[in-house]
Design a protein with these regions (language model features):
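Intrinsic-disorder/low-complexity, polar/charged segments enriched in Ser/Thr/Lys/Arg/Asp/Glu/Gln
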Residues: 1-6, 46, 56, 69, ...
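Hydrophobic ligand-binding cavity/cleft-lining segments
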Residues: 1-36
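Short beta-strand-to-loop capping motifs
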Residues: 7-9, 51, 112-114
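A short, structured loop/turn motif at beta-sheet edges
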Residues: 7-12, 62-69, 98-107, 135-139
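Hydrophobic pocket/interface hotspot
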Residues: 14-18, 24, 47, 61, ...
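Short coil-to-beta transition motif at edge beta-strands of beta-rich domains
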Residues: 41-47
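Hydrophobic-ligand binding "helix-grip"
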Residues: 52-103, 113
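A conserved amphipathic terminal alpha-helix motif
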Residues: 88-91, 113-139
Length: 139
């Protein structure tokens, strides 16, 4: 799946909106309530995206170019107790965020692998999350 949104803000402002804890929680909440990031976004690091109920995904920061590109490769589903299930629906999937800027407008493109049974949910909710990123970055 892939979605894009044009934002009247610099790449740096959009990047900060995506990945600073306070604003990440605001836009990611639309996808899965209470979602937050645990760990440091640094190439080669593993981080976790956990929802309010403690479930989520452990992912590898495979490629990171600040203010331009971030690629995650999902390693394992994470259960409420922190246990990781290696063979689960998100394992092996990719998720990327690309920012391109021109004439004061940044285009944010999010692309990701989604289990077939969740495609409808993400198609309905991810554009709303990106619109929230836009609102936050433009304020």
């Amino acid at each position: 799946m892939q979605f894009s949104v044009e934002i009247q803000a610099s790449k740096e402002e959009v990047w900060d909106t995506l990945w600073q804890d306070e604003t990440l929680r605001e836009w990611a909440d639309i996808i899965d309530p209470g979602t937050h990031l645990v760990g440091e976004l640094k190439e080669g690091n593993k981080v976790q995206f956990l929802s309010g109920n403690g479930y989520g995904v452990t992912t590898l920061v495979e490629k990171l170019t600040p203010n331009e590109f971030l690629l995650f490769r999902h390693q394992a589903d994470t259960q409420g107790n922190g246990e990781q299930k290696r063979k689960a629906e998100w394992t092996g999937g990719k998720e990327s965020y690309t920012l391109t800027e021109g004439d004061g407008v940044t285009t944010l493109t999010a692309a990701f692998d989604v289990p077939p049974e969740q495609e409808e949910y993400f198609a309905a909710n991810y554009p709303k999350a990106l619109e929230r990123v836009k609102e936050l970055a433009e304020r």
